[in-house]
Amino acid sequence: MEQIYARLRKRARQIVSLYPAPDFYQDNSFATELSRQYFETNPVIAELLRFVAKNIEDDFGHGLEHAIKVAVEAGALMIIENKLVGYSDDLNSRRIIIVQCAGLLHDIQRKQKNHAILGADYARKVLKIYPLNPDEVEDIYWAIRNHEAFKSTVEVNISKKLLLHTKKIRISEICNYYNKCANSALMTFN
């Protein structure tokens, strides 16, 4: 089975190499690069990356490389959204860290049935030792909980801090939610 998968992956990469990178990467290279800088320099992300590297299994391309890619792209989307709204650098930094945490952990239980639910529960436990406030941990929990494609999502009550209405991680909705709540007394950033 692994040989078949390896051949399929190799062929898929050959096909992809024939085409230019998606416009997103060209049009938003500043955001991708800035997100990568946050990813590579933030101590919370560095510590979480070490944890994920030790605990994630590669499951048909959903291993560490995939988690890093999702985290960096999530951060880029957050940067784009925040630039449009005009939030402060401090607030942007915190949002980027939160979505990058969600990106790193979103497939931590990938090999399990109902991996989004189990992964969200696992992430909630793991993140208790990180310098994140309870609301931030809950935001990460709900992003992971609702990320799985082709599965129904749980409608998140506004009091639970995160609105997701899709079958996979919708970083733009996380951004929109934070944008609405940035000045709310409910949001507390360290």
Which role does the model predict for each range below?
Residues 41-50, 95-98:
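Active-site-adjacent bridging/hinge elements
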Residues 49-55, 102:
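Short glycine/proline-rich turn/loop motifs
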Residues 98-102, 143:
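Active-site alpha-helix of zinc metalloproteases
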Residues 114-126:
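Post-HEXXH active-site segment of zinc metalloproteases
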Residues 136-145:
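Beta-strand segments within the central parallel beta-sheet cores of soluble alpha/beta enzyme folds
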